Amino acid sequence: MKDLTAKEEEIMRYFWDNGPLFVRQLVQMHPEPKPHFNTLSTYVRALEEKGFLSHESFGTTYRYFSLVGETDYKNQTLRQVVKKYFDNSYLSVVSSLIKEEALSVEEVRKLLDEVGESDTKKS
């Protein structure tokens, strides 16, 4: 899966949240100042080339839809971060979060409970 720029991720969120869209709908959904139609159209075509979107024809216009789900994208991005910055160790990720106080003791307990429940269901 290819990486997305921040703007491409922002555009994908519109598709993940709303389903299939025409570019003109995408323009309307953006807050002021609204981007130009051609600008969004260029981003949408780039997302299609990267394999994140596809389209169906409606006369002379296209309606675009997501090929990659938000959860799949998040999971893949997380795997890439863990591999690149934490030597592919999720333990290192959790340890770093605890050291930076971004993860509380209570949250660690909840994680351990979830892991325990998951192990119980697998048995």
At which residue positions do the language-model features occur?
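Short beta-strand "wing" residues that participate in macromolecule-binding interfaces
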Residues: 55
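Short acidic, hydrophobic short linear motifs in intrinsically disordered regions
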Residues: 21-29
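Glycine-centered, phosphate/nucleic-acid-interacting loop/turn motifs that mediate DNA/RNA or nucleotide
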Residues: 51
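Amphipathic alpha-helical dimerization/coiled-coil segments
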Residues: 76-120
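Short, hydrophobic-biased segments on the C-terminal half of alpha helices
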Residues: 41-45
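Short, cationic-aromatic polyanion-contact patches
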Residues: 4-7, 58-77
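Pre-recognition alpha-helix immediately N-terminal to the DNA-recognition helix
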Residues: 9-14, 92
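Short, locally clustered residues in the helix-turn-helix/winged-helix DNA-binding domain
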Residues: 13-19, 98
